[in-house]
């Protein structure tokens, strides 16, 4: 399980860094676990160089049984989904002209029970597109509509890899709505924009990355199965968001070190955090290619012979959507009277760009990963 956690973290950090390279100032959010689960299913059905490329990008070199690992991981995460407004949709749609091997189908039933779906795309591509969109809308309680654009499916579409994730949770300690005030958010050294800034005083886990002058704060959600981790540089020291050094230095080993509970202390913290809602949409095809998955998207080079005898089987589309909302809602109020009497409170004021991670605490799996650089349009799109 530890090997799989590290592997999934590796892919999460790789994707995060690619998105940061694409734009230094965009807000974004994505769900690494949705992407890694779908890729792991496709890896299960691949052979030859296609399998080698997928294995490398998934960081599976030291993972002995990825299928069993995902089975355990999915079971752990599914147990807490009902507690939160958390939706995780991971689908690999395969055109039914591709006859999947029975052995392959049987091998996916436990580790990927809902992820594989056959659908008639070839003979009715537009109907199939609408059917997929309708299914995604229903399974995410209406959070996502028109995931696949008109004309995106045709008779040549073979495999669609699709992920959608949304989250809105209740904190263990709610932020007092009456204390939410408009404050300046520093986009960079020179520019500010107004945000609705929430306020909380409570005992929380907080750490510090000395070499990067960055604070790490854990804000737990109700029942403490999930937490948001916020990485906040103490000052904006570059010519952009202040996150450049943190983004460049991040590796999956360093991420694991920075967010390790043993590196954090329980302290009295005065928190200022902006309310925000982010929605991002990505075509992952070019990004996954840049990470090293090439053959799987090339019908002349792809080898999915572990899945099917059908030739020219390749991934036609890889679409991902994610949405997260952060507000004051919580289950209990901290003992504010006591906390305000106590001295030596640390201040964590997120009035400048920060990185955030939604983490499943038992497995330390990254459910969502994102960057907030200030108030802007409701959604972002990346190719």
Curated annotation (Swiss-Prot):
Keyword Glycoprotein listed: yes
GO molecular function: serine-type endopeptidase inhibitor activity
Keywords: Glycoprotein, Secreted
The keyword tRNA-binding belongs to this UniProt entry's keyword annotation: no
Main localization (coarse): secreted
CDD domains for this protein: serpinB5_maspin
Transmembrane segment boundaries: none
Subcellular location: Secreted, Extracellular space
InterPro entries on file: Serpin_B9/Maspin, Serpin_CS, Serpin_dom, Serpin_fam, Serpin_sf, Serpin_sf_1, Serpin_sf_2, SERPINB5_serpin_dom
Function: May not exhibit serine protease inhibitory activity.
Record-stated family: Belongs to the serpin family. Ov-serpin subfamily.
PANTHER family linked: SERINE PROTEASE INHIBITOR, SERPIN, SERPIN B5
Protein name in UniProt: Serpin B5
Species of provenance: Xenopus laevis
Gene coding for it: serpinb5
